[in-house]
UniProtKB/Swiss-Prot annotation:
Pfam families: Somatostatin. Keywords: Cleavage on pair of basic residues, Disulfide bond, Hormone, Secreted. Residues 23-58 are annotated as: Disordered. Residues 1-45 form a propeptide. GO terms for biological process: regulation of cell migration. Belongs to the somatostatin family. GO terms for cellular component: extracellular space. This is Somatostatin-2. One of its GO terms (molecular function) is hormone activity. It is found in: Secreted. Somatostatin inhibits the release of somatotropin. The lineage of its organism: Eukaryota, Metazoa, Chordata, Craniata, Vertebrata.
Length: 73
């Protein structure tokens, strides 16, 4: 029973260690697993859509108070 409990805790520690890895390390590990299992490699471009647009500047909302509530401009 104690050996099984130790194995479960070591598995939990391994999962937590993997979750705390930086994204690049996790992606590299996932690629190593997929190549080891014979699966095709997926590039980062194929996973996420390309983001060619600059980040949108946040526009400060116009907060005019009206007796029923705030209105937007």
């Amino acid at each position: 029973s104690a050996g099984l409990l130790t194995q479960e805790w070591s598995a939990v520690e391994d999962l937590l260690a993997q979750m705390s890895l930086p994204e690049a390390d996790a992606q590299r590990d996932a690629e190593m697993v997929s190549t080891a299992t014979g699966g095709g490699r997926m590039n980062q471009e194929s996973i996420e859509p390309p983001n060619n647009l600059p980040p949108r500047e946040r526009k400060a909302g116009c907060k005019n108070f009206y007796w029923k509530g705030f209105t937007s401009c």
